[in-house]
Amino acid sequence: MKPECGQTMFRTFWSRSRDSSAMDPPLQSEEDSQTQPSLPSPLTSYRWHTGGSGEKAAGGFRWGRFAGWGRALSHQEPMVNSQPAPRSLFRRVLSAPPKESRSNRLRFSKTLWGRHKNVAPLEPKPNPKAPEPELELVADPDLPVAQIPEPPTPDMPVWNIDGFTLLEGKLVMLGEEEGPRQIRVGSASSENSMQAALGNLKDAVRTPGKTEPEAAGSNQVHNVRKLLKRLKEKKRAKSELGAYTPRDGPPSALGSRESLATLSELDLGAERDVRVWPLHPSLLGEPYCFQVTWAGGSLCFSCRSSAERDRWIEDLRRQFQPSQDNVERQEMWLTVWVHEAKGLPRATVPGVRAELWLDGALLARTAPRAGPGQLFWAERFHFEALPPARRLSLRLRSAGPAGATVGRVVLELDEVSIPRAPAAGLERWFPVLGAPAGAVLRARIRVRCLRVLPSERYKELAEFLTFHYARLCGALEPALSAQAKEELAAAMVRVLRATGRAQALVTDLGTAELARCGGREALLFRENTLATKAIDEYMKLVAQEYLQDTLGQVVRCLCASTEDCEVDPSKCPTPELPKHQARLRDSCEEVFENIIHSYNCFPAELGSVFSSWREACKARGSEALGPRLVCASLFLRLLCPAILAPSLFGLAPEHPAPGPARTLTLIAKVIQNLANCAPFGEKEAYMAFMNSFLEDHGPAMQHFLDQVATVDADTTPSGYQGSGDLALQLAVLHVQLCTIFAELDQKTQDSLEPLPTILRAIEEGRPVPVSVPMRLPRISTQVQSSFFSGEKPGFLAPRDLPKHTPLISKSQSLRSFQGAGSWASRRPDEERPQRRPRPVLRTQSVPARRPTHRRPSAGSKPRPKGSLRMGPAPCGRAWTRASASLPRKPSVPWQRQMDQPGDRYQTTGTHRPVGKLAEIQCEVAIFREAQKALSLLVESLSTQVQALKEQQEHFRCQLQDLYSRLGAGISKLDSKGGLPSNGSHRLKSLEQRLTEMECSQDQLRDSLQSLQLLSKTPGSRSQPLPLKAPCVNGADLSMGT
């Protein structure tokens, strides 16, 4: 045998020995992993033989190890547990070192769920990348155990969440897998991942028709040829599996399935210590990832946007924390700005990065920076819903493979979270421990500790914001700083998006901004107003996936490019200028083509807002401002800022280098001028060569602006799709409003009642003593005064409450009902018969299915395994590609109570307090009496109007008769050719009588008008006015003639 073959075999084989003295000394990590006792297992006696330090057997090192391996095979110890026929020892060649117990894995296979639930887990694996002991903090017995799970390793497999759905509390893979997906080759630091991948690979490479070898015999021990042949076959099979899909995309796009090739479902309710945690993009190199950890392992999933990730985290957390909205909890928000460091040793390539550790848990890391002297990062990290912590550590570590620690900054969070800390956070130069003298790190830390109450305590606050956000914004606009406006607008948008009013908020604020600017289009969305900040936050929420699809790929290519596009003659050599101009024009062409062809994936919610703005401009008579309003919001506040700073919008993992950053700046200038229809002038004369580009693509840009502002009749904007922790968002809003109202003048506070009263009640922990008016249509004052002694006010001061109804608010009745249990059995007099469900008929296009049974709302009968719940929509939902357009159940907690199974078929009107029954009966009696009085008044008015109509008809007939007689007399006189001697006297008499008749007609018209006004005024029954002069029937005419 050749020495090379022997060396390969010695580094590959596992040995199993009874005598521990014959084995190599265990590594330090193995000693640490065995600190806790564990149940005996036959796998604990396996050791990995490498070329490390150990005893050399007689006859040379290599052959001595080979002899030791043979001695281990000849001295087999009996198995502790009864096992089936022993497997071939050669089959353990490609297995990972010690096998995991099945209960220690995620229970992937369907056959594993009903079995092996009582198997004791093995010892946890040691962390392959342990921090340096000399820089570790001293253990503090009072320090709380970090609730943040351990971060994944960079080579940990990431699953695409599009291939999963949440059904009945189980995370289920969509479809059946024929075999393992593509294997992503990584380092050997993730032993669990490689073990699962290789363990699943052995079944895929098995040749059809070939049975598994029987138990190992004595002749297999020395048969090295067969062993090497099996090694080559499995290596070839692995390479064939990885040769079908190109490796040029991110792991999630390639459908990574390393560790979970046989995944079927994960029951969150059956696992212990389940936690769902969002991951910073710097940990895995992918944006919008989250991690699911449990007592036996962890998984990482990637999403398409932050809204999709937040929605999945919410749905998963509600599976094992169903009462999250009904309990009080403490949470923390942490924001860290890592600016720069100086005084450190020279940072060679690949550079030095800063890592954020919170109570021993890694949160994020910066991009590496190399070079002599000062290192500049300027990165911002924001974390929400963190568990309470005490200590923040910023560790400067080398970005190389060794990862040597350069120094650290330790900060007690009590210094930052005290009430006297500045609102913007604590910013200063922190000394770096473990580094040369004079090394400092400039950072800014802001910590906010929040007391999150049950969501029902914020009910009145959410109602006030939902119905009176315009009044609130108008009153607070002049009194807030730019930072306060940004924070308040973000909190309002998140809360109103949960209640379904965010689109109306943005539409109304945009219309108000248009009225405030007064037609000065140059000021639209260019100032620090609540409207501008709210629109920024709303577009980031609804258009994040749109940004990824439109600009993600092209911006990442530009960030990775090394081509220079500088066109300023003062910064570029003259011979290179034409080439740079051509590159810039091509890059602008590519970006512009991606934008104008992105209409199909444009968010429908944003299109509806733009359409409403254009309608408002048209109603104001300034229709030309409609495209300017759309352009100022879409390009000035979203697309061009995303091109300028791609890392802030999730388009790039870090801020681009100076060269690509200059290219992105020039492209953003061109796109913004193209949207504004503004050519480059004398201020930027070096960009004048792009004016022809602006002229050529101007019509296409205007067509795109018209497209995005047109609402498709077949497309309905989707509802809420973001994070659902409404209690946390309302707690943030409550803290912000309390801070604002503490410095607000009393006149403004009085104008915003009942909001100050609501804030004080929530702060003091007592029931809210007021109700929020809901903008319901008001009854006419005259009709209301007929049966009400006085109008009931929408807001009552606490001192005036005894004068009106008893103090029973809506939130108090809701809390009393929920405190008794929403699924508690009702009294016999309150029970209502349940409605029978309407049978659903199958259409011809849907295939026949097995009939399902409805789950009863109460009872101890368990639901059959695998059956679907027929009650309200579950917290999880089937996932499809178009996730942003899926409908969603109400995320407002007090509306979600209506969807609980126990209350689905029960009447919601039986929860009113019994103490108000007598008052309600009195009000009903008053309403009935008032209704009877109104009925009698209407009947009398109808009779009077009918009599007046008859009198008017009689007068009209008399007037027509008089006109006919007058015409006959005049015609008779004309036929005789002259008038009699006394004709002049008679003519004057006729004219006088005609004048009297006209006066009578005017008097009759006035009477009719007074009767019509009388019919609208209840309680007045006046008779028609008598005529001042008797009616003349014209008898004198016949006598005169």
Swiss-Prot record:
Biological process according to GO: negative regulation of Ras protein signal transduction; positive regulation of NK T cell proliferation
Name of the molecule in the record: RAS protein activator like-3
Pfam families, alphabetized: PH_RASGAP, RasGAP
Modified residues (Phosphothreonine): 262
PROSITE patterns membership: C2 (PS50004), RAS_GTPASE_ACTIV_1 (PS00509), RAS_GTPASE_ACTIV_2 (PS50018)
Tissue-specific expression: Predominantly expressed in hematopoietic tissues.
Organism: Mus musculus (Mouse)
Keywords: Coiled coil, Cytoplasm, GTPase activation, Phosphoprotein
Subcellular location: Cytoplasm; Cytoplasm, Cell cortex
Domain PH: 220-321
InterPro entries linked: C2_dom, C2_domain_sf, Ras_GTPase, RasGAP_CS, RasGAP_dom, Rho_GTPase_activation_prot
Sites marked Arginine finger: 526
SUPFAM superfamilies per the UniProt record, alphabetical: C2 domain (Calcium/lipid-binding domain, CaLB), GTPase activation domain, GAP, PH domain-like
Residue positions where Phosphoserine is found in the record: 41, 74, 187, 189-190, 193, 239, 252, 256, 259, 813, 816
Regions of compositional bias (Polar residues) in chain numbering: 34-44
Segments passing through the bilayer: none
Gene name linked to the record: Rasal3
Coiled-coil region: 218-243, 931-1013
Cysteines joined through disulfide linkages: none
Annotated Basic residues bias: 850-866
